[in-house]
From Swiss-Prot:
Gene3D superfamilies: S-ribosylhomocysteinase (LuxS) (3.30.1360.80). It comes from Aeromonas salmonicida (strain A449). PANTHER family: S-RIBOSYLHOMOCYSTEINE LYASE. It is an enzyme of class 4 (lyase). Involved in the synthesis of autoinducer 2 (AI-2) which is secreted by bacteria and is used to communicate both the cell density and the metabolic potential of the environment. The regulation of gene expression in response to changes in cell density is called quorum sensing. Catalyzes the transformation of S-ribosylhomocysteine (RHC) to homocysteine (HC) and 4,5-dihydroxy-2,3-pentadione (DPD). The gene is luxS. It catalyses: S-(5-deoxy-D-ribos-5-yl)-L-homocysteine = (S)-4,5-dihydroxypentane-2,3-dione + L-homocysteine. Its EC number is 4.4.1.21. Belongs to the LuxS family. It holds the Pfam family LuxS. This is S-ribosylhomocysteine lyase. Keywords: Autoinducer synthesis, Iron, Lyase, Metal-binding, Quorum sensing.
Length: 169
């Protein structure tokens, strides 16, 4: 099985909250697609709550589009990581980490403006696979934590696992 890009970086050295360019690729039509690792939690030390990450998934995707789309950027998808330490964001374009971090920070402020569970987008059995598994309070806690800690940058060259280490794992 091929080694995926996300498993070639040292998770013990990642900082959070932080933005990382996980992958950049070109389509046959020469469009740039960039995948960002939006790390909310320090791996193996913190984890996003089940209900909080689910509610954040519903809110974050729209708010990030409000703040990041335009000027050569269009978000394709934002999805939670299975390890529940962050989200992957795929987009057309190549914004720098500072622009992504500023949009992320603004989106977290937007999350805090949602005051009622009923205001969570697509919170119904027709549009959500587990519509009863939400917590606006936990999503607010996640947003407050990100805003309090600030958003940094994780660099691949600083996190790359040496070839010898990869072979030994």
């Amino acid at each position: 099985m091929p080694l995926l890009d996300s498993f070639t970086v040292d998770h013990t050295r990642m900082e959070a909250p932080a933005v990382r360019v996980a992958k950049t690729m070109q389509t046959p039509n020469k469009d740039t697609i960039t995948v960002f690792d939006l790390r909310f939690c320090v791996p193996n030390q913190e984890i996003l709550s089940e209900r909080g990450i689910h509610t954040l998934e519903h809110l974050f995707a729209g708010f990030m589009r409000d703040h990041l789309n335009g000027n050569g950027v269009e978000i394709i998808d934002i999805s939670p990581m299975g390890c529940r330490t962050g989200f992957y964001m795929s987009l057309i374009g190549a914004p720098d980490e500072a622009r992504v971090g500023a949009a992320w920070q603004a989106a977290m402020s937007d999350v805090l403006t949602v005051q009622e569970q009923a205001k969570i987008p697509e919170l119904n059995e027709y549009q959500c696979g587990t519509f009863s598994m939400h917590s606006l309070e936990e999503a607010h806690e996640i947003a407050r934590n990100v805003l309090a800690r600030g958003i940094g940058v994780n660099h691949n060259d600083e996190l790359a696992l040496p070839e010898e280490k990869l072979k030994s794992l």
